[in-house]
A protein has these predicted regions:
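… and, occasionally, acidic/histidine-rich disordered N-termini of signaling adaptors
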Residues: 1-180, 228, 232-253
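Generic non-transmembrane alpha-helical segments
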Residues: 77, 205-209, 225, 229
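Divalent-cation-assisted or electrostatically stabilized phosphate/pyrophosphate-binding catalytic cores
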Residues: 196-211, 216
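Cytochrome P450 core scaffold surrounding the K-helix E-X-X-R motif
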Residues: 138-141, 190-196
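Short, charged, surface-exposed loops that flank catalytic or proteolytic processing sites
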Residues: 85-91, 211-223
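Short, glycine/charged-enriched secondary-structure capping and boundary segments
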Residues: 70-72, 194-197
Length: 253
């Protein structure tokens, strides 16, 4: 087996809307930090060996300057371990290094949730693992509906305890199928009467957004319109209470 290696195509925790195509995937990332130009949500896209793509979305507790610093540290660790082939193994390595660095710093415990996935452009397999992160949504183009991904997958966030092991699952993506990863800022927004959107409400909003857009779907339009829907649910102007990042993937081959 050839050595596995990855090259970062894009990573950041700043306000952005970017699109990339790789390994038979179309990807779109839209990020809106709370209270500034940079926040605690880190998204990253890698091109790897053997027609493989890897994505990572990390959500550092808090927002603003402090969370932004933690996100930069997670980004640094990603570079150190980006060539680990196994998805769950990548999380375990990140967690051990992040937790040990926590022990060397003063101040409150820094925790970070993470979801990472690796897509094989040849087989269509998408392997994924969670570190206490909100479950991604899978859009089945043939069935025209969203499903939650990763039932039964658990795991502590990065920074809680060393030696944590993570489990991974796999799903095959067909032409037109999509993966939607997001930070918890998207599901924890509240309406003007204080009702939280919730994961179920966000899934429904994503389906409503897709049904209202013209076909063939432009992925950037979906991300932008879904974010606008989250903002409309809030029903108020001003800064978000938490950072929001949406990372969408669609199989094109």
């Amino acid at each position: 087996m050839r050595p596995f290696g990855c090259m970062e195509l894009w990573a950041g925790n700043e306000r952005a809307h970017r699109a990339l195509d790789l390994a038979g995937l179309e990807s779109d990332v839209i990020a809106v930090p709370s209270g500034g130009d940079k926040g605690g949500d880190l998204s990253a896209v890698f091109s790897c060996s053997d027609n493989t793509a890897r994505v990572v979305l990390a959500d550092c507790v808090g927002h603003g300057y402090t969370a932004s610093g933690v996100a930069r540290h997670v980004h640094h660790l990603l570079h150190r371990y980006q060539d680990i082939r196994d998805t769950a193994g990548l999380l375990a390595a990140l967690n051990d290094a992040f937790t040990l660095s926590n022990e060397k710093t003063d101040g409150p415990l820094r925790l970070t949730t993470v979801v990472t996935g690796t897509f094989d452009g040849t087989s269509g397999e998408f392997n994924f693992a969670y570190a206490a992160h909100p479950r991604m949504l899978l859009w089945r183009e043939r069935e025209r509906r969203f499903l939650e991904l990763g039932e039964g997958l658990e795991g502590f966030p990065l920074g809680y305890i060393t030696g944590e092991t993570y489990s991974q699952q796999s799903v095959r993506l067909n032409h037109g199928d999509m993966i939607l990863a997001f930070s918890d800022g998207a599901t924890e927004v509240r309406s003007v009467v204080g009702e939280q959107l919730t994961a179920k409400g966000f899934l429904g909003l994503a389906e409503k957004t897709l049904s209202g857009l013209p076909q063939p779907l432009v992925l950037q339009d979906f991300s932008r319109t879904l974010l606008e829907g989250v903002q409309l649910y809030r029903g108020q102007e001003g800064e978000l209470e938490d950072d929001i990042t949406l990372l969408t993937l669609r199989r094109m081959t």
